[in-house]
């Protein structure tokens, strides 16, 4: 369920902070959100796939940690990011 190269480039162009940004916290959250959405759809079709469910929970935890970090650093950036990604938190 990895992201394709074209999807990664699309996310980078949408969420990068500057021209050479490829790994900022915002981008990491965007990547994780996309993978979480893909995995959620997979689990709807395959409810007994417990290994994938565990991976999903790990990704959600990692995203939660990054969002907490962004929120502590800059509340405005945090609000903008969750609004753009459509995350309720």
From Swiss-Prot:
Region spans: Disordered: 1-24
Any GO CC annotation of this UniProt entry: cytosolic small ribosomal subunit
UniProt keyword annotations, A-Z: Ribonucleoprotein, Ribosomal protein, RNA-binding, rRNA-binding
CDD domains from the UniProt entry: Ribosomal_S15p_S13e
Signal sequence bounds: none
Cited PROSITE patterns: RIBOSOMAL_S15 (PS00362)
SMART domains reported in the protein's UniProt record: Ribosomal_S15
Single GO MF annotation: rRNA binding
GO terms, biological process: translation
Entry-linked InterPro entries: Ribosomal_uS15, Ribosomal_uS15_bac-type, uS15_NS1_RNA-bd_sf
Function (record text): One of the primary rRNA binding proteins, it binds directly to 16S rRNA where it helps nucleate assembly of the platform of the 30S subunit by binding and bridging several RNA helices of the 16S rRNA. Forms an intersubunit bridge (bridge B4) with the 23S rRNA of the 50S subunit in the ribosome.
Entry-linked PANTHER family: RIBOSOMAL PROTEIN S15, BACTERIAL AND ORGANELLAR, SMALL RIBOSOMAL SUBUNIT PROTEIN US15M
Family stated for the protein in its record: Belongs to the universal ribosomal protein uS15 family.
NCBIfam families listed in its UniProt record: S15_bact (TIGR00952)
Subunit-level organization: Part of the 30S ribosomal subunit. Forms a bridge to the 50S subunit in the 70S ribosome, contacting the 23S rRNA.
Protein name according to UniProt: Small ribosomal subunit protein uS15
Organism of provenance: Microcystis aeruginosa (strain NIES-843 / IAM M-2473)
Gene from which the chain derives: rpsO
